[in-house]
Structures are given as structure tokens and as C-alpha cells.
Amino acid sequence: EDLPRGWGDEQAPGSYRLRRRDDGALFGFAAGAQSAKPVFFPTDQLLWRGRRTRGGRGLEVDPATGPGADADRGGPPYAVLGVRSCDLGAVGIHDTVLTGRGVGDVHYAQARQEAFIVAVACSDPGGTCFCGSMGTGPAPEAGKGARFDLSLTEVLEGGHGFVVDVGTQRG
């Protein structure tokens, strides 16, 4: 009910148009401009809390939020529905940068570890899409880009249905 059944889009440089589809597709639109990154790496996040010491010349960091404290995003884990393979490729790069090389962002790592990702294959890529040239699509592949728990390919011929690929044990 909350998914855009029967809607598609037309994307071209400098142009974006919604269009009605006759097939009732739930995912019949191309990847939008907003990626999955803000789900895992928000623009506003509490990292630590502190207060001035008596006399106002120093800073006392709350041990529950300071360096070495366990990451706490302050909310439940996310389930992300409709992540496209190009976004999985980008999240895979974020994973390397933000969790690799021995130094990482514990908050990002926790969000990624807890998230349940349902990827969706692009059946109608936009005119501005470049997943084919980057080797990231149009369908998600296990081991390429970021991990996904489930991947859906929408099938409209012979009735509306989905082919489901399992990417992880949780899926």
C-alpha cells in the first residue's frame, strides 16, 4: 500500500519526470539522487558529551560517550528496502573507508552490522544511470559491493511476483 505501485520515471541530464505505468510495478523506477549513505552515516549524530570542570578551565568527558565507549546509535536497527546495486557499490566503498585499515568509525560499523538490507534489481534504468559501465548492476550480486540480506527481482510477466536471492544467513 505504501509502495508506488504503477509509477515509473524518466531521467535524463537536467530532467526528471514521473510517469504512470500500466503494469503495476512496485519498483519500476530508476535509482533516485539520494543514496543509502545517510542511513548509515547521518549528518547529525551525538559522538560524545562533556562538561566544563570546576573553574571552567578544563573539560570532563562523560565516560559513557567518550573515546573507547561502545557505539550507540540511540535507536533500533534499520531495515532498508529498495537499495539499488549502484548504491550497494557506493556503500561498499564507504565500508572500506569507514571500517577498514584498522581505524574505523564505530557508529557507522554498528549501523552497517545491524542493518537488514533488501536490494532491488533495476528493471528500468534511467538515462543518467551508469551501473553497467561501473560493473555494479543492474542487478545486485553477492560478493560485489556491500553485502545485502535479500535481493528482489520484480517479475511482471504471467502475474506479479518476485525472484528472491539470499545474500546472507539472516536473509
Model-derived features with residue positions:
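Iron-sulfur-associated redox domains of electron-transfer enzymes in respiratory
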Residues: 1-171
